[in-house]
Amino acid sequence: LFDQTISEFQFVEQRIWIKDFINYKVGVDGISILFILLTTFITPLCVISINNSIKESLSEFLIAVLIMESFMIGVFCSLDLVIFYLFFEAGLIPMFLIIGIWGGARRVYSAFKFFLYTLLGSVLMLVAIISIYWLNGTTDIVELYESGIDIKYQNLLWLAFFSSFAVKTPMWPVHTWLPDAHVEAPTAGSVLLAAILLKMAGYGFIRFSLGLFPVASEIFTPLIYTLSVIAIIFTSFIALMQEDMKKLIAYSSVAHMGYVTLGIFTIQQQGIEGSIIQMISHGLVSAALFLCVGVVYDRMHSRLINTYGGIVSIVPKYSILFMVFTLAALGLPGTSGFVGEFLILMGAFKDNFLVAVIASIGVIIGAAYMLWLYKRVIFGKLINNDLKQMIDLNKSEVFILSCLAVPTLFFGFYPEPLINTIEVSISDLIDEYNFRLAGRL
């Protein structure tokens, strides 16, 4: 069983792949295990949900989804930089196919935009990994933690990794691929993209930016703060202007990931814990919101907000579950969304009061666009007569959304299992960070 009381990697497996260069080495710690559990929880729900939305080449679609799951698990348990990079980039291929083959009218454009943005962002990371091998003679993450990386090279290496993680997060201003990808992707593709794929970058910031380049992370923290605050405020206002439900949720994802990057670089226990909990919560809530959009799209073939309104009495089960996830997305106390945001802001107030105050404004704007979305879709007058024929959630849809609602509410009232799992690993990471910073290595 996994031991929460130690920070070392557990269940480690190692095999020689290319002698004196690459080892296949995998393992988990308190940070990575939560993302692996999230991946293995969300993917089966995606598989169950596709029975209505995918009409052609269903078996091929399932193959792409399951291959993608394998690559994402590989990312979270990799203990070698080369293995991490291979899994990190290989995950692009099935998502590219999911968008490009089973997506909407502009699927080819969106698929190539997604692929090129994320691939080009990762080229510098490959160069950095090769440089690290040249400098240290190893790409083993555990060995690199122990030996440290020369301070003379940390800034350039940090920027190279940042170029990849910033695009994948995505951070402002390299976020424009995400709304297009979400709009054109099938529902299951949007769920995987928002719930898991974006988390690989947040995980990368914690594992590599803080773990390998502490001196550079300290230097570039003001840059991260600036970009995070812009993402939180700017994309929240953009979300308020959207008429497409998927685009609104996509922009809200950029804002939520802005909180994640802010919390990570506070280098505070509460901040990093909050960022991880926020990523887990966002994985659950964003998956549910995209599934909710998929439900009404399957029935009415429209994602436009003004198509709907006045359906609360027609689809009561849908209205209740949609309300749960809307409130979780805006961070209502008692939902998992509140726990992450609260801890992040606690960490931010300890490190930089002004940044924390500005980021807090995003909470208000977030509540505005989520409540505005819910009000226009669920309440109001029934103008569109076609909505009278709308069918409420079937048993399969109730099951899927309930599976997401239960942990969303449970961790909102009792986040202790999440905190206990990550606490020791984060504490050890911060101690090592401060030790390296004090020694300037």
Annotate each PLM feature:
Residues 315-317, 370-441:
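Cytoplasmic/organellar membrane-interface segments at the starts of transmembrane helices
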Residues 89:
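Short phosphate-coordinating micro-motif centered on Lys-Gly-acidic
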Residues 40, 340, 400-404:
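Core segments of transmembrane alpha-helices
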Residues 2-9, 133-138, 415-420:
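Helix-to-loop transition at the C-terminal end of transmembrane segments
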Residues 45-53, 70-82, 95-378:
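Hydrophobic transmembrane alpha-helices and their helix-loop junctions in integral membrane proteins
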Residues 1-63, 142, 428:
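Transmembrane helix-loop-helix hairpins at membrane boundaries of multipass inner-membrane proteins
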Residues 1-2, 118-127, 328, 364, ...:
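Hydrophobic alpha-helical membrane-insertion segments
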Residues 62-72:
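Transmembrane alpha-helical segments of multi-pass membrane proteins
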